[in-house]
Amino acid sequence: MLIPSKLVNEQFDDRYFDVVDALNEARQIYFRNNNLIERITTGIESKTPFIIGETGFGAGRVVVALMEFVKKSGLRNISIEYNSVELYPLSPERMLDILSGFKDRVGEEIDALVETYRSIDITVAGWHSAKIQKSFGTIDLNLWIGEALEMVESLEKSCDVWFLDGHSPKKNPSIWRPELLMAIGEKTKQGGTCSTFTVASDVKSALIEAGFILNKYPGCGGKKHVLQGVKY
């Protein structure tokens, strides 16, 4: 399949997301496989934020998909802390161009993300925080500009779930290296989860070492299987 050049990250010669149905891929791999709605509902009832960690912010596709997903759930008073990392941040204009293929489906969510992203000085390394306020509640976006291991080690709170969404292990092995996945395990709550599109044996071994019990789920977007893990 021909991949549009605008979807390719030149740093890794790899696409930012699946070109078949990237929004559905995010919903299935990261949201449904992690029982997000049920777990976010528990957070609403206990008045505690649901904490997400992500490796590989890219064009913000997963954030856009998340906004659509929770909006359709009908939940209100949602509080999400979304912690992500990007070593090579895009300009807001490039982000908008990459996401433009979804404009007819999630235009409102794309506009909300890009407007929020414009408030971040992507030329400065370290943490940047901004708030996305929607009818369903609030997403506190915390974006680390820099290296993923530094981001994970600097987190003050452990996460309820991790979306492992970096470029493929063959294209960007550093974001799948054992010491990073071990640190992610250490910054995951007991009973917390992670999920990813890759079933590479090295990644599976590192996640098991990091304390996750792995489950294999049916894939989507051309992937036969995907992984989900539970921290014990």
Whereabouts are the PLM-identified features?
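S-adenosyl-L-methionine
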Residues: 96-155
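Conserved beta-strand signature within the Rossmann-like core of class I S-adenosyl-L-methionine
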Residues: 161-164, 190-198
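Class I S-adenosyl-L-methionine
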Residues: 200-232
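Conserved beta-strand/loop positions that form the S-adenosyl-L-methionine
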Residues: 53-55
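A short glycine-rich, Lys/Arg-flanked "PGG" loop and its adjoining helix->strand segment in the class I
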Residues: 174-190
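Glycine-rich SAM-binding Motif I of class I
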Residues: 59-64
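Short SAM/SAH-binding signature in class I
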Residues: 141-143, 157-166
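Rossmann-like AdoMet
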Residues: 1-50, 65-104, 110-112
